[in-house]
Amino acid sequence: MQVLTKRYPKNCLLKVMDRYSAVVRNMEQVVMIPSLLRDVELSGSGGSVQDGAPDLYTYFTMLKSICVEVDHGLLPREEWQAKVAGNEGSEAENEAAETEEAEEDRLSEELDLEAQFHLHFSSLHHILTHLTQKAQEVTQKYQEMTGQVL
């Protein structure tokens, strides 16, 4: 596993982001054959995935995708929306979404910006910590599957 070289305070978001990136890079180095992760559940006895539950491969690709954005910044809004929507959706849906977003923007300006910042900051910290744990679990599960457990 890669060692963090920068020193940040314990609960600093930059430290959480660096740790997440390091754990995902380690996961990418350990998982040599990602296709082995298909149809394997994250928790449990290593059985096949139940209906609707994400498999290890889904986690693997999601964690890598998020890491790219953490390391290199956000995609432009249009690209992100196209990626999420899978390039499917009508113009009417897009216009409705833009109208709803404009209303949300107006309301958000009226709210306390410091409170919004704190909410989003703490949520991001929590989510990145959770994703880091998931990346460690995917790595550990892959090592168990391939007999690489140290």
Swiss-Prot record:
Record's family?
Belongs to the SPOT14 family.
Q: Where is the composition biased (Acidic residues)?
A: 90-105
UniProt-recorded Gene Ontology molecular function terms? identical protein binding; molecular function inhibitor activity; protein homodimerization activity
Q: Quick check: keyword Lipid metabolism in the entry? A: yes
Q: In which tissues is it expressed?
A: Highly expressed in liver, lactating mammary gland, epididymal, retroperitoneal and brown fat. Mainly expressed in tissues that synthesize triglycerides.
A Pfam family that this protein carries is Spot_14
This chain's source organism reads Rattus norvegicus
Q: Name it.
A: Thyroid hormone-inducible hepatic protein
Superkingdom: Eukaryota
Query: Annotated region Disordered: where?
Result: 83-105
Q: How does it assemble?
A: Homodimer. Heterodimer with MID1IP1. Interacts with THRB and PLAGL1.
InterPro entries in the cross-refs: Lipogen_MT_Stabilize_sf, Spot_14
Q: Which GO terms describe its cellular component?
A: cytosol; nucleus
The listed locations are:
Nucleus; Cytoplasm
Quick one: a GO biological-process term for this protein? regulation of triglyceride biosynthetic process
Gene3D superfamilies for this protein: 6.10.140.1610
Q: Which UniProt keywords apply?
A: Cytoplasm, Lipid biosynthesis, Lipid metabolism, Nucleus, Phosphoprotein, Transcription, Transcription regulation
Q: What does this protein do?
A: Plays a role in the regulation of lipogenesis, especially in lactating mammary gland. Important for the biosynthesis of triglycerides with medium-length fatty acid chains. May modulate lipogenesis by interacting with MID1IP1 and preventing its interaction with ACACA. May function as transcriptional coactivator. May modulate the transcription factor activity of THRB.
Phosphoserine is carried by which residues? S90
Q: What does the induction field say?
A: The mRNA levels in rat liver are up-regulated in response to thyroid hormone (T3) and a carbohydrate-rich diet. Up-regulated in liver at the time of weaning, when pups switch from a high-fat milk diet to having to synthesize their own fatty acids. Down-regulated by fasting. Levels of mRNA increase within 20 minutes of T3 administration.
